[in-house]
UniProtKB/Swiss-Prot annotation:
Gene: Inos
Catalysed reactions listed for this entry: D-glucose 6-phosphate = 1D-myo-inositol 3-phosphate
Biased composition (Polar residues): 550-565
Keywords on record: Cytoplasm, Inositol biosynthesis, Isomerase, Lipid biosynthesis, Lipid metabolism, NAD, Phospholipid biosynthesis, Phospholipid metabolism, Phosphoprotein
Pathway, per record: Polyol metabolism; myo-inositol biosynthesis; myo-inositol from D-glucose 6-phosphate: step 1/2
Protein name as it appears in the record: Inositol-3-phosphate synthase
Record PTM Phosphoserine, positions in chain: S536
Organism expressing this protein natively: Drosophila melanogaster
Lineage, uppermost ranks: Eukaryota, Metazoa, Ecdysozoa, Arthropoda, Hexapoda
Known role: Key enzyme in myo-inositol biosynthesis pathway that catalyzes the conversion of glucose 6-phosphate to 1-myo-inositol 1-phosphate in a NAD-dependent manner. Rate-limiting enzyme in the synthesis of all inositol-containing compounds.
Residues making up the signal peptide according to the UniProt record: none
Length: 565
């Protein structure tokens, strides 16, 4: 097994202390509080809060239990873990392919940490900022309404190259999903032919069985921590009613009464919370009814979701952010999808499609609300989402978007994008990131630095840090929903940077825009020392070749201007 403490950075600062148990930093958290006066003026009050942030250095042995383990995403994740663990290679038409984790921000993206002696940007892999779970050490288990073992489930999914499937089939054939909860009222009727591996009994009996399964997995595998993640079929929305599920006590009573509106995904979430396991919802249904959120808060167990943000929606959250930020007014967004995998088959039913439509439609709301120069209080773009089931295209989802925007003097600009997404190969790395960052979040705490008696405080149970990976981010009550991909990514980077005593990335680069020789005798460098084997990161300055854009794409580019792009 590979070592789990893969952090290779040492920050040289009196504000950073490292011992066998924790990385602890003294951190000045700076924000601005805005007040509106009676005459409409905005008064901005900069604020600084002195904090201590500590991160546990011990990385636990992590177990991941997938609901829908035998589906496209579950079988692909299991296959990818095996292929990467064995560093497999296989032949394709275009040559030899090696197993990798492209599409994962923890495994295949880098983070800016500072500038070197030549003024060049230095990036390191995100996974090296803090001790994180190594994917090779993750143990997977789970449930599925289909009893196929994982080898046959992988073949049924038709996602991976056959040359790879043949190398790992025997290993995956030894893995078989536990029986799962099947309620035909919540998923499409066309899924009934798969349902040969189900938990019988009342909802309470199903809940108790899921709890037993989690305990059994923990004991048999010897894992220290378990995360449960829903990657099964999209359910219809459950009704939310007083007396049914608006409080934790109502929800528990409804479970005990076998109420028909307690969905399978909510039962899984309740069981996970009862066992102290982080629960992540990768589908768009309203698993997290108010009573479930309250239950997680009472038990202080993390929940996160909703719905993997992998393809069309991720592009939409970037493009609309760009347009609105550029002072261009999107007035119409039409999104069309067709796909042929089992997700598409399930979504061909109207109630299940409605769950997905809601998830995909709300992604631009916060960006529209950010610019009242473009939009009035109740104004927003026309936004329509269409999903169709076309069996022949399989997992190769086709997404077509048309963005119409108003520009200067009544002009219009139209952007049309065609996006072919291999659905499960985009979603699977997100699952990996969700469980790795979800586990890391359990080891991060902070407290008031000015009060020695102040308690250490963890993240709130609604883990909004994972919003970057979700179409419809779940946030704590009273918090603002952020869909802007740039802001979501910046939150992850800056929190990880704060955990090792580095300031937020500001992009001010004052040392490049002003003559610092008249200000200080010291070079304007972050004092960061790389220990062990240094990262293979080149710089770009004045026409030199470099890989300083945060990507390792195998090709060095020549800088042709002085702006670093």
């Amino acid at each position: 097994m590979k070592p789990t403490n893969n952090s290779t950075l040492e920050v040289i600062s009196p504000k950073v202390q490292v011992d066998d148990e924790f990385i602890t930093t003294d951190y000045d958290y700076q924000t601005s509080h805005v007040k509106r006066t009676a005459d409409g003026q905005l008064q901005v009050h900069p604020q600084t809060t002195s904090l201590k942030i500590r991160t546990g250095r011990h990385v636990p042995k992590l177990g991941v239990m997938l609901v829908g383990w035998g589906g496209n995403n579950g079988s692909t994740l299991t296959a990818a873990l095996e292929a990467n663990r064995r560093q497999l290679k296989w032949r394709k038409r275009t040559g030899v392919q090696e197993a990798n984790w492209y599409g994962s921000i923890t495994q295949a993206s880098t983070v800016f940490i500072g500038s070197d002696e030549d003024g060049g940007d230095v990036y390191v892999p995100m996974k090296e900022l803090l001790p994180m779970v190594e994917p090779d050490n993750i143990i997977v288990d789970g449930w599925d309404i289909s009893g196929l073992h994982l080898g046959d489930a992988m073949r049924r999914a038709e996602v991976l190259d056959v040359a790879l499937q043949d190398q790992i089939y025997d290993q995956l054939a030894q893995l078989r999903p536990r029986p799962s909860i099947y309620d035909p009222d919540f998923i499409a009727a066309n899924q009934s032919d798969r349902a040969d591996n189900v938990i019988r009994g009342t909802r309470l009996e199903q809940y108790e069985q899921i709890r037993k399964d989690i305990r059994d997995f923990r004991e048999r595998s010897g894992v220290d921590s378990v995360i449960v993640l829903w990657t099964a079929n999209t359910e219809r929305f459950a009704d939310v009613q007083p007396g049914l599920n608006t409080t934790s006590q109502e929800l528990i009573a409804s479970l005990e009464a076998n109420h028909s509106e307690v969905s399978p995904s909510t039962i899984f979430a309740m069981a996970s919370i009862a066992e102290g396991c982080t629960y992540i919802n990768g589908s768009p249904q309203n698993t997290f009814v108010p009573g479930l959120i309250q239950l997680a808060e009472e038990k202080n167990v993390f929940i996160a979701g909703d719905d993997f943000k992998s393809g069309q929606t991720k592009i939409k959250s970037v493009l609309v952010d760009f347009l609105v930020g550029a002072g261009i007014k999107p007035v119409s967004i039409a999104s069309y999808n067709h796909l042929g995998n089992n997700d598409g088959k399930n979504l061909s039913a109207p109630q299940q499609f409605r769950s997905k439509e809601i998830s995909k439609s709300n992604v631009v709301d916060d960006m529209v609300a950010s610019n009242r120069l473009l939009y009035g209080p109740d104004e927003h773009p026309d936004h329509v989402v269409v999903i169709k089931y076309v069996p022949y295209v399989g997992d190769s989802k086709r997404a077509m978007d048309e963005y119409t925007s108003e520009i200067m003097m009544g002009g219009h600009n139209t952007l049309v994008i065609h996006n072919t997404c291999e659905d499960s190969l985009l979603a699977t790395p997100l699952i990996l990131d969700l469980v790795i960052l979800g586990e890391l979040s359990t080891r991060i705490q902070l407290r008031n630095a000015e009060k020695e008696s102040a308690p250490w405080v963890p993240f709130k149970p609604v883990l909004s840090l994972l919003s970057y990976l979700c179409k419809a981010p779940l946030v704590p009550q009273g918090s603002q929903v952020v869909n802007s991909l740039f802001r979501q990514r910046a939150a992850i980077e800056n929190i990880l940077r704060g955990c090792i005593g580095l300031p937020p990335i500001s992009h001010m680069t004052l040392e490049q825009r002003f003559d610092f020789s008249t200000i200080t005798n010291e070079p304007p460098l972050k004092r960061v020392k790389i220990l062990g084997q240094p990262c293979s990161v080149e710089s770009v300055t004045n026409g030199k070749k470099l890989h300083a854009n945060g990507h390792s794409n195998g090709s060095a580019k020549l800088a042709t201007n002085g702006n670093g792009h």
